[in-house]
Amino acid sequence: MKKSGKFILMLIITSLFATSCSKSTTGQPYATQKDNAWSRNACGAFSMAYYLAETNQISSSDVAKTAKKIYKKIKFDPSAGFGDYSDPFKIIRESAQYAGTVSFKMNLSAPQTPGEKLMKMLFDYVGADGSQFEDITDLGTALAQDEYVIEIVVPRAGVDLASPMNNPLHYVLTYWKDGTLYTLDPARGKEEPRQNFIDGTTTKWSFCNSGIFLKK
């Protein structure tokens, strides 16, 4: 090989290496709620920040900074008894400035699973107006291909319906991509097929079939 040919080959290899390295600093995996002491209960804020990153409204490098700002606005009021978790109704209000349409959907009329029943109890507890919510029976079916949902789950294998306020809430971002439903968990920072998330966490989570639906 001529010297000029070797030089060109070296440039190509160097360029490919630089490109592969640059991918690790942008996009997924994102910062997670486990990265800082302040963010251990900030899954709602991180789910919102992930939505902003996925829809190119913020840089992936700004996820943690954005989540911290959002978290201060969406935490439950101390009197609510939910500690430092995120209030879904505050998430709805905060999301309005980032999405073209925002709606809360849940199995309101005929809750079947413990998670669905918990959401109905919390719904009744806060005196929410049912006319402002959409009744669904399956989250994946209700989610459009161009929508995202900040989904609510309970990070326990079981739900305590006798003491509904004792159930912590966890938020994940769920969406369709290339015909497959994906979930992006703030505890992990990287998307995985929805079915993998369910199969890998069935002893850890109780699914509530509810969440804040966002469309850019």
Which residue ranges define each predicted feature?
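Surface-exposed acidic loop/strand-edge motifs in secreted or periplasmic proteins
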Residues: 95-130
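Short amphipathic alpha-helical segments that mediate assembly, nucleic-acid/protein binding
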Residues: 9, 63-64, 114-115, 119
